């Protein structure tokens, strides 16, 4: 489904067609090539010193046990629609530079840019991405341990 934004000024179609649906086809399974394309787009996001402070934790619906654990970290409202998503991605930011272990004040900004690249690449592939903040941070942290 293509849904173009009603903009006040002209913007690129890639941006105007990006939106965050709350309905996904429960039968759809994302293919490996598309997943690799999403993360390649993330890799090309700008970052301070080229540090790429992001980390992604990927949960595929066809690997149901870890995917369900990730789904259960979401708020009930987000679980209601995310349960039909083919993939769940946890986006994390490293708060320290890798080259000197000093605080990276721009890590969240840079990580946000990489997440937006994923959203735009999803849109260019005819897929949809929906970022969300409604989750239990402690539960998410336990997923990666």
Enumerate the language-model features and the residues they cover.
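Short, charged/polar surface micro-motifs in flexible loops or helix N-caps
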Residues: 61-67, 94-97, 138
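Short amphipathic alpha-helical segments, especially helix-boundary/capping motifs
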Residues: 11-17, 44, 92-96, 113-117
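Acidic pyrophosphate-coordinating catalytic loop
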Residues: 79-80, 142-145
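Small-aliphatic-rich amphipathic alpha-helix that forms the alpha element of a beta-alpha
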Residues: 42-43, 89, 101-143
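Helix-adjacent hinge/juxtasegments
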Residues: 75-111
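Hydrophobic transmembrane alpha-helix bundles
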Residues: 16-20, 86-99, 123-128
């Amino acid at each position: 489904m293509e849904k173009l934004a009603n903009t006040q000024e002209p913007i690129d179609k890639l941006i105007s067609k990006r939106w965050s649906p709350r309905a996904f086809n429960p039968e759809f399974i994302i293919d490996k090539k598309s997943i690799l394309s999403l993360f390649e787009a993330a890799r090309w996001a700008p970052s301070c010193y080229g540090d790429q402070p992001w980390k992604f934790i990927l949960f595929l619906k066809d690997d149901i046990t870890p995917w369900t654990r990730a789904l259960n970290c979401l708020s009930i409202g987000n679980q209601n629609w995310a349960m039909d998503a083919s993939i769940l991605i946890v986006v994390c930011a490293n708060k320290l530079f890798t080259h000197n272990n000093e605080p990276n004040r721009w890590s969240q900004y840079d990580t946000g840019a990489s997440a937006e690249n994923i959203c735009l690449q999803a849109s260019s592939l005819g897929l949809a991405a929906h970022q969300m903040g409604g989750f239990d941070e402690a539960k998410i942290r336990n997923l990666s341990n």
